[in-house]
A protein has these predicted regions:
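Auxiliary Fe-S-binding modules of radical SAM enzymes
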Residues: 1-23, 201-203, 207-307
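Canonical Radical SAM [4Fe-4S] cluster-binding loop centered on the CxxxCxxC motif
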Residues: 15-61
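Aromatic/hydrophobic pocket-lining residues that form the small-molecule binding cavity
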Residues: 59, 92, 122, 161, ...
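Conserved SAM/AdoMet-binding glycine-rich loop
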Residues: 67-170, 250
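Catalytic cores of alpha/beta
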Residues: 124-126, 184-202
Length: 307
């Protein structure tokens, strides 16, 4: 038998190509392939992947293979690809039932989800999925600014973002939202920060995870940058934007800068740690004016997108 990644049979186990950093130690289970939307102008993750929902028996076969390898040692599972909540509720419940039957010590099952899908899905369906054992949703907000959401072709309005978050929390999910620092470029950082804070304040998610935007080849925003239509924000602008975002937030969320490409390792519980994180940003802004080495380090970090 040919063994591939993690010792599983290379010819049949279907690994999700992406997962959140917080799921580094989780078993990866692919329920869908690609992205059903796949139009966001900043993203090239699934541009070459045709979206499809995997057959239930294929998924169960992967679960059985993982059980053969790991036995009862699996404690967390991440479901990929980009939006497993688009799967019919009864099918997703069967997948979750199979996971918990196979791994008796399973404590957490998480998944990417799209806000538009969550906003449309009936609350009763979300409650069934939560009761079956899906515990946390990772959702890309990117920005709460209405105009920017249109520009980056996110396919959801601020109101739909809020509806998705509130409904998911009501169903009992932990809700983890992702914000793209710098997605407004050099010119729109203030409206990006304020609009994003406004949406986050209405949702009050469990986790706010920030990522520094880096234009990806084969994406429309990369082409816009190459043609001079999008101006990458400076490290100072990214830091000022982050500071303004924190100042405008009135939530009870974990604020996490948990990716190596981010300029500062900001981690804290809001509101208690807000001033501590703002102080870190102020110190970094002062340092940029005094230390060329710090600027070089920050510029380098923005290029570390594949870790």
């Amino acid at each position: 038998m040919t063994l591939g990644r993690f010792g599983l049979r290379r010819r049949s186990y279907d690994f999700p190509p992406f997962r959140p950093p917080s799921e580094a130690n989780s078993l990866l289970l692919r329920v869908t392939r690609g992205c059903p939307w796949n139009r966001c102008s900043f993203c090239s993750m699934y541009k070459t992947v045709k979206f499809e929902i995997r057959d239930l028996e294929e998924i169960k076969s992967d679960i059985e293979m993982a059980k053969e390898l790991y036995g009862d040692r699996v404690g967390t599972v991440f479901i990929g690809d980009s939006n497993s909540l688009i799967v019919k509720t009864e099918v997703l419940v069967q997948v979750l039932n199979s996971l918990y039957a196979s791994f008796p010590h399973l404590e957490r099952v998480t998944s990417y989800a799209r806000a538009k899908t969550l906003a449309k899905k009936p609350l009763v369906d979300l409650e069934k999925i939560r009761q079956a054992g899906l515990t946390r949703l990772h959702v890309g907000l990117e920005t709460g600014d209405r105009d920017l959401l249109k520009e980056i072709e996110k396919g959801a309005t601020p109101e739909e973002m809020v509806e998705a978050g509130r409904k998911s929390k009501k169903a009992g999910f932990e809700y983890s939202l992702y914000v793209l620092l710098g997605i407004g470029g050099e010119e729109k950082w203030e409206s990006h920060a304020k609009g994003t804070a406004e949406v986050l304040n209405q949702i009050d998610p469990h986790f706010i995870r920030v990522r520094t935007f880096i234009p990806q080849p084969n994406s429309p925003l990369y082409e816009a940058m190459e043609e001079g239509r999008f101006h990458m924000p400076s490290p100072e602008t990214i830091l000022k934007e982050t500071k303004l975002l924190l100042e405008e937030l009135h939530v009870n969320s974990q604020f996490l800068s948990d990716h190596i490409s981010n300029l500062l390792p900001l981690h804290g519980k809001l509101p208690g740690d807000k001033e501590k994180m703002i102080q870190m940003i102020d110190e970094a802004l002062r340092g940029l004016g005094e230390d060329d080495g710090l600027r070089e380090e920050m510029e380098m970090r923005r290029k570390l997108t594949n870790l």
